A protein has these predicted regions:
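Short hydrophobic beta-strand element within catalytic cores of glycosyltransferases
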Residues: 327-330
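Membrane-proximal helix-turn-helix segments that form the acceptor-binding/catalytic region
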Residues: 140, 151-171
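N-terminal subdomain of nucleotide-sugar transferases
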Residues: 1-53, 58
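Conserved acidic donor-binding segment of nucleotide-sugar-dependent glycosyltransferases
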Residues: 342-343, 347-354, 363-368
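Carbohydrate-associated surface elements
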Residues: 176, 199
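Aromatic "clamp/platform" in nucleotide-sugar-dependent glycosyltransferases that forms part
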Residues: 310
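Short alpha-helical donor nucleotide-sugar binding micro-motif in glycosyltransferases
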Residues: 289-290, 297-302
Length: 414
């Protein structure tokens, strides 16, 4: 069967393919590259110039090109100032290079990652008559129309401006930030939106794990109830609220648990200090980055997953916990309730209700039967609703195929 898409030019804001540090988590980008090159599709990535040599996939169908790395500048600026600087500096750094590259290699489509790519794609796609699509891995606070207007604009100004520059197709991954609803309300035609599920390592559901052996190998207590979370340790994950909830638990129940925080990031030292300040630092283990290959063993040796993300608790770690049969206690933000179904796959708590979070943890620590029942239902739910990486990337490729085929039909190209 003849394909419409044989060559893709990708504009990315990331200089490497790892999401949580070297070996610390498989990015969507990595799965995308593996699947498409396996299917004979030529990929050209235009990425920020790395500061040092980065690990890349070796494939004859994969080529990296670079542009000036504006994302290394002004990292110490306050968040809003940094974001506005990046938004202003990105087009001048990218547009000329993207136009030259697109004219040289003549891709079937230009695919941009994140809202940063919208203006360059809009300009170059129209100028060179090349189909364009943007992939949004979530929309941050763009769905939070409940915020006061000033707060909403402070959080989302650059995304709102970027959406003024349309592209042919918007691929939005469902991370729980309700991207389809947000873009539609902001004026993107619904027929131009493809709302796709996140991919998962669905084979994890069938991986056998000896809990005792895994706990011993990872230095975890053999008999305690493990309440875990893992992510990049940054402010938006609100791990300090997780720790404060544990501090509010009934003391005899708290003595039965060990808290395990996986991942690394700029907040780690502050969180370690907070655990000591709360008086149970000896019951908290910070593992650092957990290699992706070990996450399934880590989760299947755990008992409860705590999810306190400010943006969404439908991101990959809570989903992976459900897939591994671990019930999730989560703050109910954005689209979290799509996967954390209260009383079925876990327990939901009103956002920022730390005392309520503590009570929910107590329920699962106290009631072994309920905890196991929710875990079994979580695994069954994940088997039914989650999709594999291959299936998810194939959905994305189908979107691109249909877009390019339609463009060719309009031009009268067979």
């Amino acid at each position: 069967l003849k394909r419409a898409v044989n060559k893709i030019l990708v504009l990315s804001i990331w200089e490497d393919i790892w999401s949580l540090g070297e070996g610390g988590g498989v990015a969507d980008e990595l799965q995308f590259i593996r699947h498409l090159t396996k299917n004979g599709i030529e990929l050209h990535f235009l990425i920020p110039r790395p500061q040092a040599r980065k690990e890349t996939l070796q494939d004859s169908l994969l080529t990296y090109h670079t542009y000036p790395n504006i994302f290394r500048h002004f990292r110490r600026l306050p968040g809003i100032a940094q974001r506005l600087y990046w938004a202003a500096a990105f087009p001048p750094a990218v547009v000329g290079r993207l136009e030259k590259l697109a004219a040289e290699i003549r891709p079937d489509i230009i695919l941009g990652f994140t809202h940063h790519s919208l203006y360059p794609l809009n300009r170059i796609g129209r100028k060179l008559d090349i189909p364009t699509a943007v992939k949004l891995f979530g929309v941050m606070y763009l769905d939070r129309f409940d915020f006061p207007r000033a707060k909403y604009l402070l959080r989302s100004a650059e995304q709102i401006v970027a959406l003024k520059f349309p592209v042919d197709r918007y691929i939005i991954l469902n991370d729980g930030t309700r991207g389809e609803m947000a873009l539609t309300r902001l004026g993107v035609p619904p027929e131009k939106i493809s709302f796709l599920p996140n991919g998962m390592d669905t084979e994890w559901a069938d991986v056998p794990v000896n809990r005792a052996e895994v706990r011993k190998a990872m230095g975890l207590p053999p008999d305690d109830i493990l309440i875990v979370t893992f992510s990049r340790l940054i402010r938006s994950k609100r791990i300090e609220l997780f720790l404060r909830a544990v501090a509010l638990m009934d003391r005899p129940l708290r003595e039965r648990v060990t808290i395990v925080i996986g991942g690394d990031g700029p907040e780690r030292q502050r969180l370690e200090n907070e655990a000591r300040r709360l008086g149970f630092g000896d019951k908290v283990i910070f593992t650092g980055v957990i290699p992706h290959r070990d996450v399934v063993q880590f989760l299947k040796a755990s008992d409860i997953f705590g999810a306190t993300n400010e943006l969404t608790n439908m991101s990959l770690p809570p989903c992976e916990a459900l897939l591994c049969g671990v019930p999730v206690v989560a703050f109910d933000v954005s689209g979290t309730a799509e996967i954390v179904r209260d009383g079925e796959t876990g327990l939901l708590v009103p956002d920022r209700d730390v005392a309520g979070f503590a009570r929910r943890l107590e329920v699962l620590v106290r009631d072994d039967e309920l905890r196991l029942r929710l875990g079994a239902r979580a695994a069954a739910f994940a088997r039914e609703h989650f999709v594999s990486w291959d299936d998810r990337i194939e959905m994305e490729l189908d979107v691109l195929e249909r877009l390019v085929s339609e463009k060719k039909r309009r031009r009268g190209i067979s």
